Amino acid sequence: MRLLVTGGAGFIGTNFVHSAVREHPDDAVTVLDALTYAGRRESLADVEDAIRLVQGDITDAELVSQLVAESDAVVHFAAESHVDNALDNPEPFLHTNVIGTFTILEAVRRHGVRLHHISTDEVYGDLELDDRARFTESTPYNPSSPYSATKAGADMLVRAWVRSYGVRATISNCSNNYGPYQHVEKFIPRQITNVLTGRRPKLYGAGANVRDWIHVDDHNSAVRRILDRGRIGRTYLISSEGERDNLTVLRTLLRLMDRDPDDFDHVTDRVGHDLRYAIDPSTLYDELCWAPKHTDFEEGLRTTIDWYRDNESWWRPLKDATEARYQERGQ
């Protein structure tokens, strides 16, 4: 298969490209990435001889059309994704997440190419901490941040292009990912690299917020299953049913790194911080016979810690600037 992977130098996209090269050696993979601060050429160094990397913006209609015309399918990861950055400046999120997705949709419509669009559970808003309900495919959208609002808008565009123009597209909404190649601005790698650089870990507020954690390799195996077997027009929710509050995650991480589990600082909470995310993935499990493999969270966290220990040259150039931005916000 000739695959075009947008955002393939970012966290989840990089891991998808690595798995495609490893598990589907007959795929011809082209990566389109703007190589911004969160998309790094170094993340693809191990597979650079097996792929084609094109540096470019997904709002560049001419470039996108050319690359889509050469492809059998597009897996659309490219997005601005860090909520704190969206709160500071939402404009890049509108540009990439909405206009970029529109540009991709017009190209796949023009050339009749299959599309899978990657989205987030944050489009559904949040759940109460004491409410055992979970998000399903029929949960109404209720985004609460500029980031999630732009992703919700992108999802709606995909659905409209499927219905109005017959575009062959699927959507997946996934829970919080962790694993290798994740930028140090994100919760888990920030804490790991804080410990590794002698800084104190930081926890927003009381740490009661609950996230539904999934290893990035499980997310990407589900994406591949949907790409290969998913029903056109369908939305699939991806989760390994790994709900944990942030305080528990941080204490587990510190214990695995041989640190006092209470050796961290509480910092100013994020504005409008969503309380709880939880996904019901039963449609994906039942319809496409998919199941996660990385169900032992501690083991997944341990291997992630080991990756950051072993790959300091990858994250060290990012660390000081990231912490400086957090310090400006009192976080």
UniProtKB/Swiss-Prot annotation:
Keywords: Lyase, NAD
Any one of the GO BP annotations: dTDP-rhamnose biosynthetic process
Gene3D superfamilies: NAD(P)-binding Rossmann-like Domain, UDP-galactose 4-epimerase, domain 1
Enzyme Commission designation: 4.2.1.46
Binding note for cofactor: Binds 1 NAD(+) per subunit.
Cofactor: NAD(+)
Gene Ontology cellular component annotations, sorted alphabetically: peptidoglycan-based cell wall
Domain of life (superkingdom): Bacteria
Residues reported to bind substrate: 81, 120, 176, 186-191, 202-204, 211, 246, 269-273
Pathway(s) of this molecule: Carbohydrate biosynthesis; dTDP-L-rhamnose biosynthesis
Binding site for NAD(+): 11-12, 33-36, 57-58, 77-81, 96, 147-151, 177
Residues at the active site: 121-122, 147
Catalytic activity: dTDP-alpha-D-glucose = dTDP-4-dehydro-6-deoxy-alpha-D-glucose + H2O
GO molecular function, one term: NADH binding
NCBIfam families to which the protein is assigned, alphabetical: dTDP_gluc_dehyt
Similarity comment: Belongs to the NAD(P)-dependent epimerase/dehydratase family. dTDP-glucose dehydratase subfamily.
Subunit annotation: Homodimer.
Role summary: Catalyzes the dehydration of dTDP-D-glucose to form dTDP-6-deoxy-D-xylo-4-hexulose via a three-step process involving oxidation, dehydration and reduction. Involved in the biosynthesis of the dTDP-L-rhamnose which is a component of the critical linker, D-N-acetylglucosamine-L-rhamnose disaccharide, which connects the galactan region of arabinogalactan to peptidoglycan via a phosphodiester linkage.
Protein name (Swiss-Prot/TrEMBL): dTDP-glucose 4,6-dehydratase
